[in-house]
């Protein structure tokens, strides 16, 4: 009887620990707002702050729309390998903007690409995944829309798993949104991310 109890104790302890490590960041589709369809390339810190205010004042936040995502064209170049935001469009910087969004009880999202460039031709994350992930974590990013432009024939599954591993390595919970267009059957491998 003691052996059975010991076995059950070890099994249940191991199972509980394994379940803890499989914690899902976003068990349902995230609800929120993305800047691309509204502003395209013409985004600014002022607009994003205004959208954050509106998400709260109009009741969207209370209805579950908690993610505010800044899409492509927030970035301009890399400095010592670190992605830099457009200081004209975002004079306070991305960290300050994320802090503002968080102060409204919302989650802050940002955009990048698995290719060498984003869809709009800005610097992508290819080859900089771990550096970008650390930068995003330092800024307080909660969500990453990860696009598939300028990928030079890369393996989609490997590219998305690389960014997933990079985000996990930061210790900050950042939801990874696979924006791969469906050409590489992400429904077969995306759940593992």
What is the predicted role of each segment?
Residues 19-49, 54, 174:
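N-terminal module-boundary/linker segments of secreted carbohydrate-active enzymes
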Residues 1-20:
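Bacterial Sec-dependent N-terminal signal peptides
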Residues 108, 174-176:
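Hydrophobic beta-strand scaffold residues
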Residues 51-153:
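Aromatic-lined carbohydrate-binding/catalytic grooves of carbohydrate-active enzymes
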Residues 123-124, 183-193:
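Substrate-binding cleft/loops of secretory-pathway carbohydrate-active enzymes
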Residues 157-174:
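Short acidic, glycine/proline-enriched helix-loop-strand junctions
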Residues 112-116, 177-183:
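Acidic carboxylate-rich catalytic motifs and surrounding loops in phosphoryl-/glycosyl-chemistry enzymes
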Residues 23-27, 60-63, 101-103, 137-138, ...:
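Extracellular/periplasmic catalytic domains that process cell-envelope and extracellular macromolecules
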């Amino acid at each position: 009887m003691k052996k059975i109890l010991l076995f059950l104790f070890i099994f249940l302890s191991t199972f509980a620990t394994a379940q803890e490590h499989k914690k899902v960041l976003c068990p349902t589709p995230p609800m929120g707002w993305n800047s691309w369809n509204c502003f395209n390339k013409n985004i600014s810190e002022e607009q994003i702050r205004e959208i954050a205010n509106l998400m709260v004042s109009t009741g969207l936040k209370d209805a579950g729309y908690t993610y505010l995502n800044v899409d492509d064209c927030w970035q301009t170049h890399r400095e010592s390998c670190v992605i830099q935001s457009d200081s004209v469009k975002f004079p306070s910087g991305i960290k300050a903007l994320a802090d503002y969004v968080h102060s409204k009880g919302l989650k802050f999202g940002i955009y990048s690409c698995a290719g060498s460039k984003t869809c709009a031709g800005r610097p992508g994350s290819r080859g900089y995944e771990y550096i970008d992930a650390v930068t995003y974590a330092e800024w307080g990013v909660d969500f990453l829309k990860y696009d598939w432009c300028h990928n030079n024939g890369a393996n989609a599954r490997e590219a998305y798993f690389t960014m997933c591993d990079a985000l996990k390595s930061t210790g900050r919970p950042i939801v990874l949104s696979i924006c791969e267009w469906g050409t590489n059957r992400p429904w077969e491998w995306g759940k593992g991310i």
